Amino acid sequence: ENGLHRVDFIGFSCYSSADCISWKNEGLVLKASDQPGSPLHKSRVGERPKVLYNEKSRKYVMWFHLDSHDYMTAHTGVAVADRPTGPFQFVREMCPNRFDSRDMTLFKDTDGKAYLIYSSDWNKTLRIAQLTDDYLDVNGVYSHAFPEQEREAPAIFIKDGLYYMITSGCTGWEPNNALFGISHNIFSGWKLIGDPCTGENARQTYFGQSTYVFEKDGRHYLMLDHWNPSNLKESGYSILPVRADNGQLTVSFQEYTSL
């Protein structure tokens, strides 16, 4: 309708797996609303949910991109639950540190401090905002990375004291080549290095877009969104091995029977 690619927002689902190959659908953990005026109304956009466990509160905290149907609001949403399978209770809609926020991720550092990393300034700059101790808000301490470089879809991790951040270019639903950057300080000194992807379809990031890096059994893995703009509800994911060594980063596409 009107040339827009969208589906009604129904909420966020949770899937669980022991091997990242076979997945169990745990159902909707945060549901959209039919109530007019609700920040979670089905006519709005909810994307890229990320969940961290807070040891102090013993709560699971979700942050996500929350927007109007035309992507002009550019806010974040926050929700909290006792279990990763929910149900999550909506806490607030916000504009972190009074900046617009679109593609975003969460990162928990080795010291337990957590950060919201989000594309801002109409996708021209990535911002890095420290969260409060309970992870339910930003604490006012923030910085930026890659100003005027138009990077989005951040996925960040740390290895051997060095931060790595994988990002995407801004081409809407269409795939593009990824770039990664490194820094010894999460708030400053970020330097773009190059495309980490190798092999066939590397320049299109294997027709995906970075969304998160996680660690399992001492190895890092990159999760990609695979958008289907003609039928967004049929979009999927892939999980790929990441090799990080002394400031160099390599991602390869391969089939796995287990991780």
Which residues are covered by each model-predicted region?
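Carbohydrate-active catalytic/glycan-binding domains of CAZyme proteins
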Residues: 1-259
